Amino acid sequence: MSLSALLNQLVELTGNISNAYTIALYKVDADKETLVLRHHISLSLNFDIDAKVKFGEGPIGNVAKSKKLFLVENFEKNPTKICIYKKNENLKSFLAIPVISNDLEGVLIIDSKESYSFPAKQQKIITGLANQMAWQLNQEKQYSKKDTPPQS
């Protein structure tokens, strides 16, 4: 299995265990200080696959800048403010986790249409999976600088 396929599988597994409405892994574009979509699964037809998030902008960008988890258990604000949906999706819970290897590699976001969807135990499991994603993203970045493809 390639590193790319393994990373996609980690994102999908995390979405499954968290009962996500949407799960999305954004990777860092350090030159532009933005986050770009790497992989996602969403039940929404309004998910914006072209959205780019600037560091420090909205909850996702703030996680990239602060490198600290962001959790809202009763999220009722308009999700267009988080720049991942083209229109309001009436979300109830939102979790954004920094994906860090040695440096910030990306941000993992998970949302739900249910309130209080991310208890402490689940956050711990998701954080562990995010750590694996960080390693995978770092490997992809290293190998993209070389001509030889990564070995699994």
Model-flagged regions — what are they?
Residues L45-N46, E73-S93, S112:
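Signal-transducing coupling segments at domain and membrane junctions
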Residues S2-L25, P59, L129:
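Amphipathic alpha-helical coiled-coil segments that mediate homodimerization
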Residues T127-W135:
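Allosteric cytosolic regulatory segments
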Residues A24-D48:
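GAF sensory/regulatory domain recognition
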Residues K92-I100:
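A short, aliphatic-rich beta-strand micro-motif
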